Amino acid sequence: MFKLKRVYDEPSSEDGFRVLVDRLWPRGVSKERAGLDLWLKDVAPSPELRKWFNHDPARWKEFQKRYTAELKGKEGAVHVLREKAKSGNVTLVYAAHDEEHNGALVVKRFLEHHTK
């Protein structure tokens, strides 16, 4: 099962395998506090797409489309997440303040629709 959690929220045992899916390290968070098992930069949106989106909700629909297309080309990184999910929860950790418009949500939906 795939879950989402902000990096600023406390890790918990229910999180299972915790993966940071952002390209940039979150501000003000130590590696210890983040409690991550993996930082998977390769699954993050391209720098160009991230800059274009700029957390603008008006660009959300188009961002989802473009990012989903990018994820289809990142099979190696996506495979890591699929494999981890076979043995328990995988929590996709992200830094964005907007919980409804962020890259981790796109990754989660992609994994749920493209994992058997």
Functional labels for PLM-detected ranges:
Residues 1-116:
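Residues lining hydrophobic/aromatic ligand-binding pockets adjacent to catalytic sites
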